[in-house]
């Protein structure tokens, strides 16, 4: 039987595909984008599980730019150059005939464009939890469809189309067909309830996933433990590093007492929280926060975050505190 191929750009996506691999009839192959922080180290831990037939890391920044200007150059050269950049210059190739199904979460990436360059059908998966069911109108898809001659572009494969609009997308996964808000016909949607997949994990499977994602030694006494989940406002241009440090110190002082402090930084947040909070347990920032729902031998008394949706699917805390950015900054000024 042919294996499946999973392509991941975030640690959450790796978690999703590891859960899928438990159900696979034969070990699947996995490709990790080097855009994922610590991709090589994570790849080694994944190989050690024996869950995958192979784990490769793909550095998309080394593949150059295939985009062309002008109608004829785009029509005749863009896909040829895209394949050449990946296969000849970077030395990476995929043979679609070797796989039963190809699953990818971010088809706007170099790897997604490479699949389109080769005409390989794929299943588009949710890039974050229940993203196909989110409110907001899915503006990226709507703006793409508002481009001139969209129907012709889609019919004849002119240029690249993302987020499920490419004509050879086999299916679009959703947490719930009933609750899906993406603008696609229902028959194009494929339901996979990730919440149910997490709940169905066995004790042994949870332990295996913990060995991949939980790399920080845990304290013996976790009574009253509090979890602070950060967001990197500095990289978003919303404040400077010093303001962010003061803000999180103030938030922790007010909301994170009563037990050991755990810090789970956003994957893009490179701040040194071990220095900011001496004695705190700083978890691997690349770890999906969803892992904490099942991987720890205890529950948190409280989980705290600022201007983030991370607590929406978080189930490992008795109390959840979600502050607005204005509220957190006001506490820093108090």
Predicted stretch roles:
Residues 55-59, 281-287, 323-324:
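Short acidic-hydrophobic, aromatic-tinged amphipathic segments that line or gate anion-handling sites
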Residues 256-286:
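Catalytic donor nucleotide-activated moiety binding site of glycosyltransferases and closely related
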Residues 289-333:
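A donor-sugar binding/catalytic signature common to diverse glycosyltransferases
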Residues 139-224:
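A nucleotide-sugar donor-handling region in carbohydrate enzymes
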Residues 7-162, 310-312:
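Active-site and donor-binding regions of nucleotide-sugar-utilizing enzymes
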């Amino acid at each position: 039987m042919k294996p499946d191929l999973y392509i991941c750009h975030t640690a959450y996506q790796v978690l999703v595909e590891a859960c899928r691999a438990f159900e696979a009839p034969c070990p699947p192959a996995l490709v990790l984008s080097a855009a994922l922080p610590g991709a090589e180290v994570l790849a080694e831990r994944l190989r050690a599980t024996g869950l995958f037939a192979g784990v490769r890391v793909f550095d998309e920044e080394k593949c150059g730019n295939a985009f062309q200007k002008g109608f004829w150059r785009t029509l005749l050269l863009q896909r040829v150059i895209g394949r050449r950049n990946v296969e000849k210059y970077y030395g990476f190739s995929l043979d679609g005939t070797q796989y039963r199904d190809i699953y990818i979460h971010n088809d706007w990436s170099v790897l997604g464009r490479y699949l389109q360059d080769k005409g390989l059908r794929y299943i588009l998966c949710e890039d974050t939890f229940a993203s196909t069911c989110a409110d907001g109108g899915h503006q990226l898809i709507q703006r793409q469809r508002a481009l001139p001659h969209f129907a012709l572009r889609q019919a004849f494969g002119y240029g690249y189309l993302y987020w499920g609009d490419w004509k050879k997308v086999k299916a679009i996964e959703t947490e719930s067909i009933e609750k899906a808000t993406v603008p696609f016909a229902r028959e194009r949607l494929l339901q996979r309830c990730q919440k149910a997949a997490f709940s169905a994990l066995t004790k042994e499977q949870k332990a295996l996933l913990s060995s991949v994602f939980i790399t920080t030694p845990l304290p013996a006494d976790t009574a009253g433990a509090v979890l602070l989940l950060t967001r990197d406002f500095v990289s978003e241009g919303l404040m400077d590093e010093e303001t962010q440090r003061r803000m999180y110190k103030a938030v922790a002082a007010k909301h994170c007492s009563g037990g050991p402090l755990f810090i789970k930084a956003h994957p893009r947040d490179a701040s040194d929280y071990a220095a900011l909070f001496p004695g705190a347990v700083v978890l691997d920032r690349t770890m999906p926060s969803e892992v904490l729902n099942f991987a720890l031998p205890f529950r948190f008394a409280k989980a705290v975050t600022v201007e983030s949706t991370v607590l929406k699917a978080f189930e490992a805390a008795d109390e959840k505190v979600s502050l607005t950015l204005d509220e957190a900054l006001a506490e820093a000024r108090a």
